[in-house]
């Protein structure tokens, strides 16, 4: 009698790749809703556009590689890549921004290396960095949070309607012919600066941290809107941990290193750096810690390595935010840490039993 012997590993996860990707998208919903509430419907428009483009590119590349496209589409990895890139760009960014970004993410950063499971770098972050370096104006032109405008700190002379929003994204002009620059000029106050950007600009102009934080955009812990967006992604990340979709090592390493670095410099250089709470709840901190850095393909594979990997990202995020040329450093930090993964895994691989 012959028996079928399966190859190792013999222990399998109950969750398949499509299941994991669905959980990631589901747990990112709170953050998406928070962004939509604070920054308008443009976030949802960018997401729908991104998913459509990403799935189309995924299918075309698979056909070009003479492989069945439906198998790749069913793993939902392209959907997650589109999701992460869509929430990282300004809601009013023109349609070609997300298109160029997804071309880099799907075609170059993913399939050029062999497809799912073969890419050494996070595809969404590759796309984001390419866009940020190539089109800095479009990628840093965030609108003011809607509650800040409604509170009267910034007065919109001609509010942007949903029709104007769609027209701006796809044609570059509103229905009545106004450009995005003219729309922003119609709002008095800080319209294109995130709290991180405003804080760094203030420091460069010679203001102290306390003077900068007195501006209306910094109301709350880490800036109007952004603190709640980060808390929403934190809630989604905790669900991912509870469902064992991700492990705790990378988020703890990331947030722990960022907390230690910001606490140290806030204690000894209080007028030159933001508070730890500001760093934890501003920018893409929670999105990066739970949804980006935890990419199982491009992250470290050992337990000690994952903690070190997260700590490297957290440290680099603080360094780039404090002394770099860009307001936030999550994307650059993740890619630099991706480069270190082979070295991290080599020196943190577990000792073989008996040796």
UniProtKB/Swiss-Prot annotation:
InterPro entries documented for this protein: NqrB/RnfD, RnfD_bac
Residues modified as FMN phosphoryl threonine? 194
Q: What does this protein do?
A: Part of a membrane-bound complex that couples electron transfer with translocation of ions across the membrane.
Q: Which UniProt keywords apply?
A: Cell inner membrane, Cell membrane, Electron transport, Flavoprotein, FMN, Membrane, Phosphoprotein, Translocase, Transmembrane, Transmembrane helix, Transport
Signal peptide extent: none
Q: Which GO terms describe its biological process?
A: electron transport chain; transmembrane transport
Which subcellular locations apply to this protein? Cell inner membrane
Name the HAMAP family on file.
RsxD_RnfD (MF_00462)
Cofactor(s) annotated in UniProt = FMN
State the source organism's domain of life.
Bacteria
Principal cellular location given in the protein's record:
membrane
Q: Which EC number(s) does UniProt give?
A: 7.-.-.-
Task: State the similarity comment.
Answer: Belongs to the NqrB/RnfD family.
Q: Which residues cross the membrane?
A: 23-43, 44-64, 78-109, 129-149, 221-241, 250-270, 273-293, 307-327, 328-348
The family database entries (Pfam families) matched by this protein are listed as: NQR2_RnfD_RnfE
Q: How does it sit in the membrane?
A: Multi-pass membrane protein
What protein name applies here?
Ion-translocating oxidoreductase complex subunit D
Its quaternary organisation is: The complex is composed of six subunits: RnfA, RnfB, RnfC, RnfD, RnfE and RnfG.
Root EC class? translocase
Q: Which organism is it from?
A: Vibrio vulnificus (strain YJ016)
Q: Name one GO cellular component term.
A: plasma membrane
């Amino acid at each position: 009698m012959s028996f079928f012997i399966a190859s190792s590993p013999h222990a399998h996860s109950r969750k398949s790749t499509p299941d994991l990707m669905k959980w990631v998208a589901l747990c990112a919903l709170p953050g998406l809703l928070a962004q939509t509430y604070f920054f308008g419907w443009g976030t949802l428009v960018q997401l729908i556009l991104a998913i459509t483009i990403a799935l189309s590119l995924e299918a075309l590349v698979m056909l070009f590689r003479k492989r069945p496209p439906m198998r790749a589409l069913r793993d939902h990895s392209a959907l997650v890549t589109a999701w992460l890139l869509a929430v990282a760009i300004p809601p009013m960014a023109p349609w070609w921004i997300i298109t160029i970004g997804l071309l880099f993410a799907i075609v170059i950063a993913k399939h050029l290396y062999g497809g799912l499971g073969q890419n050494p770098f996070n595809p969404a972050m590759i796309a984001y960095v390419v866009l940020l370096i190539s089109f800095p104006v479009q990628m840093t032109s965030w609108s003011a949070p809607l509650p800040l405008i409604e509170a009267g700190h910034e007065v919109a002379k001609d509010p942007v309607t949903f029709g104007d929003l769609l027209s701006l994204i796809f044609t570059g002009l509103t229905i009545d012919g106004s450009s995005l620059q003219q729309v922003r000029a119609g709002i008095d106050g800080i319209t294109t600066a995130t709290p991180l950007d405003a804080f760094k600009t203030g420091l460069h102009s010679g203001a102290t941290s306390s003077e900068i934080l007195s501006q209306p955009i910094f109301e709350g812990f880490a800036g109007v809107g952004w603190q709640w967006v980060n808390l929403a992604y934190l809630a989604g990340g905790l669900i991912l941990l509870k469902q064992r979709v991700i492990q705790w090592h990378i988020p703890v390493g990331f947030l722990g290193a960022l907390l230690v670095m910001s606490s140290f410099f806030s204690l000894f250089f209080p007028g030159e750096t933001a508070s730890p709470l500001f760093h934890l709840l501003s920018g893409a901190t929670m999105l990066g810690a739970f949804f980006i850095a935890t990419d199982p393909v491009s992250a470290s594979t050992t337990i000690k390595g994952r903690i070190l990997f997260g700590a490297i990202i957290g440290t680099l995020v603080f360094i780039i935010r404090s002394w770099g040329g860009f307001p936030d450093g999550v994307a650059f930090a993740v890619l630099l840490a991706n480069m270190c993964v082979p070295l991290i895994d080599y020196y943190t691989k577990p000792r073989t039993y008996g040796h």
